[in-house]
Amino acid sequence: MRVAMLTREYPPEVYGGAGVHVTELVAYLRRLCAVDVHCMGAPRPGAFAYRPDPRLGSANAALSTLSADLVMANAASAATVVHSHTWYTALAGHLAAILYDIPHVLTAHSLEPLRPWKKEQLGGGYQVSTWVEQTAVLAANAVIAVSSAMRNDMLRVYPSLDPNLVHVIRNGIDTETWYPAGPARTGSVLAELGVDPNRPMAVFVGRITRQKGVVHLVTAAHRFRSDVQLVLCAGAADTPEVADEVRVAVAELARNRTGVFWIQDRLTIGQLREILSAATVFVCPSVYEPLGIVNLEAMACATAVVASDVGGIPEVVADGITGSLVHYDADDATGYQARLAEAVNALVADPATAERYGHAGRQRCIQEFSWAYIAEQTLDIYRKVCA
């Protein structure tokens, strides 16, 4: 069996959960079968890379993406099965299936109709990305959802989709890469920032998008206990508008309290591991999240999590066991922000519970989110669609 794995992101260009998913999945699948990675961007080891047509440099970003999809589809002719990830490569998978009469497996990491804020980023291209996703999903031989909540969303958004074709295979975590680091050393990223190791610390890691709820967290931080520091590892803004909103919110917070740190540069895994391990609590304020690999990363570092109760997050963060879930209400932003602050303050005030949540979170990662198991599940899907 030869798999053509289609992805926008692949190391060293990985900036989101879908890229992490593909990276880890490929590493384990290659122990089981032949996998050719087809990605977008600059040439790199271990993958075939494709750039958008330069003649579309000033075109809408969706059109530019689709030009790379066409080349990617053409390159998948030798595959036994083609496996696409996100709308960015869904059309390539769909076309390869038609051209070469091979099965198409599609992993949905999010759903375009449930991310209306993408209009800010893509303009009319949002309608294109939505059309691409719908076309590919409804024609795929199998669809993988990264959580049960995601599967439910898919069947609701695409009611004509055959439920028997939609399988749940959750994201995973490599607990040998993500583990509790020792105390921050002199010269470490936290020491260089000036973070006080004797004060509690709440941490956020993620992209600056409306989906991730960064402004909700920064606003909630006005209600944090006065000794709580906030470390935001946040970059790769979707749009200048949302970047400006976060910038204004962080500046206002910093005027009103000490211990506000914003890291906009891309960090290494080692640096992120250090920050997550040092955190008193990791906060995930997402307003939409099919699963949320970053919660697994924090849990693997034995850190308690405070997270919204949206999407697949409750399938990762066990409320009252590995962290605290906070109800998100799109019609009550103020209430949501107050609840986030309350949950953070409660764990800061109870270090024993925070420590217990952290240890339980790491055990949950080890026992239930192994990439080796996820690769076996994925291979089973390939076998079924090729039978």
From Swiss-Prot:
InterPro entries: Glyco_trans_1, Glyco_trans_4-like_N, M1P_synthase
GO molecular function: glycosyltransferase activity
Gene3D superfamilies named in the record: Glycogen Phosphorylase B
Record carries keyword Glycosyltransferase: yes
Changes seen on gene knockout: Inactivation of glgM affects the production of extracellular alpha-glucan (two-fold reduction), but not that of intracellular glycogen and 6-O-methylglucosyl lipopolysaccharides (MGLP). Cells lacking this gene are also impaired in their ability to persist in both the spleen and the lungs of mice. Combined inactivation of both glgM and ostA is lethal, potentially due to accumulation of toxic levels of ADP-glucose. Combined inactivation of both glgM and treS results in absence of alpha-glucan.
SUPFAM superfamilies from the UniProt entry: UDP-Glycosyltransferase/glycogen phosphorylase
EC number per UniProt: 2.4.1.342
Keyword tags: Capsule biogenesis/degradation, Carbohydrate metabolism, Glycosyltransferase, Transferase
GO annotation terms (biological process): capsule polysaccharide biosynthetic process; glucan biosynthetic process; glycogen biosynthetic process
Protein's pathway: Capsule biogenesis; capsule polysaccharide biosynthesis; Glycan biosynthesis; glycogen biosynthesis
Reaction catalysed by this enzyme: ADP-alpha-D-glucose + alpha-D-glucose 1-phosphate = alpha-maltose 1-phosphate + ADP + H(+)
Regulation: Inhibited at high G1P concentrations.
Enzyme class, UniProt record, top EC level: transferase
Function, as annotated: Involved in the biosynthesis of the maltose-1-phosphate (M1P) building block required for alpha-glucan production by the key enzyme GlgE. Catalyzes the formation of an alpha-1,4 linkage between glucose from ADP-glucose and glucose 1-phosphate (G1P) to yield maltose-1-phosphate (M1P). Also able to catalyze the elongation of the non-reducing ends of glycogen, maltodextrin and maltoheptaose using ADP-glucose as sugar donor, however the rate of the reaction appears to be too low to be physiologically relevant.
Additional comment: Maltose-1-phosphate (M1P) is generated by two alternative routes: the TreS-Pep2 branch and the GlgC-GlgM branch, however it seems that TreS-Pep2 branch provides most of M1P for the GlgE pathway in M.tuberculosis. Attempts to disrupt both the Rv3032 gene and glgA in order to create a mutant simultaneously deficient in both alpha-1,4-glucosyltransferases turned out to be unsuccessful. Thus, M.tuberculosis H37Rv requires a functional copy of at least one of these two genes for growth.
NCBIfam families per UniProt: glgA_Coryne
UniProt record similarity statement: Belongs to the glycosyltransferase group 1 family.
Annotated PANTHER family: ALPHA-MALTOSE-1-PHOSPHATE SYNTHASE (PTHR12526:SF590), GLYCOSYLTRANSFERASE (PTHR12526)
Name this polypeptide is given: Alpha-maltose-1-phosphate synthase
Gene source species: Mycobacterium tuberculosis (strain ATCC 25618 / H37Rv)
